[in-house]
Amino acid sequence: MKEIVIASNNQGKINDFKVIFPDYHVIGISELIPDFDVEETGSTFEENAILKSEAAAKALNKTVIADDSGLEVFALNGEPGIYSARYAGENKSDEANIEKLLNKLGNTTDRRAQFVCVISMSGPDMETKVFKGTVSGEIADGKYGENGFGYDPIFYVPKLDKTMAQLSKEQKGQISHRRNAINLLQAFLEGEKNV
């Protein structure tokens, strides 16, 4: 069985990859390097994902997958972007990030936004590959729903007439930015199998 190493300490992400890649042995990097951490010094999701996957691939001499993701709000020139997890400051809660975003948007009528996920795959004998997924929506006027995490309670998906937090895990999994990026990664891996 082929192995996929995920350059993340986030068990939720690792579990998502395990479900999506049942034919692979999926392990988190902390199982191999307990204190692995890469400072995200890039200015884009792509740069940060590549920093993580290339550092992990070099440390392990193995093929590694990493991702970087976040929310971009058009009226805020793409904020919070790469700072999505720490928009209100280091170690602040999802609630604090949401509050800052809603306050900054105020009564702005242009509430278009997108979730972005960039997955990068690096290895010792390969050029780094990058796969980007997005999901478009709008920022709601308040929080709705109990599911999900992060900005899900305020990310409204017009075609479903619900926020991400009002969707079941299965519904969100079918349309999410991470799912879209993983679909591209899967297509690439399937193509590699058939070569």
Curated annotation (Swiss-Prot):
Assigned EC number: 3.6.1.66
Domain of life: Bacteria
Positions annotated as active site in the UniProt record: D68
GO cellular component terms attached to this protein's record: cytosol
Cofactor annotation remark: Binds 1 Mg(2+) ion per subunit.
Residues annotated as binding Mg(2+): E39, D68
Gene Ontology molecular functions: dITP diphosphatase activity; ITP diphosphatase activity; metal ion binding; nucleotide binding; ribonucleoside triphosphate phosphatase activity; XTP diphosphatase activity
Cofactors: Mg(2+)
Keywords: Hydrolase, Magnesium, Metal-binding, Nucleotide metabolism, Nucleotide-binding
One BP annotation, GO: purine nucleoside triphosphate catabolic process
Catalytic activity: XTP + H2O = XMP + diphosphate + H(+); dITP + H2O = dIMP + diphosphate + H(+); ITP + H2O = IMP + diphosphate + H(+)
CDD domains xref list: HAM1
Protein residues bound to substrate: S8, N9, N10, Q11, G12, K13, S69, F149, G150, Y151, D152, K172, H177, R178
Pfam family for this entry, one: Ham1p_like
Record PANTHER family: INOSINE TRIPHOSPHATE PYROPHOSPHATASE, INOSINE TRIPHOSPHATE PYROPHOSPHATASE/HAM1 PROTEIN
Family membership: Belongs to the HAM1 NTPase family.
Function: Pyrophosphatase that catalyzes the hydrolysis of nucleoside triphosphates to their monophosphate derivatives, with a high preference for the non-canonical purine nucleotides XTP (xanthosine triphosphate), dITP (deoxyinosine triphosphate) and ITP. Seems to function as a house-cleaning enzyme that removes non-canonical purine nucleotides from the nucleotide pool, thus preventing their incorporation into DNA/RNA and avoiding chromosomal lesions.
Identification of the protein by name: dITP/XTP pyrophosphatase
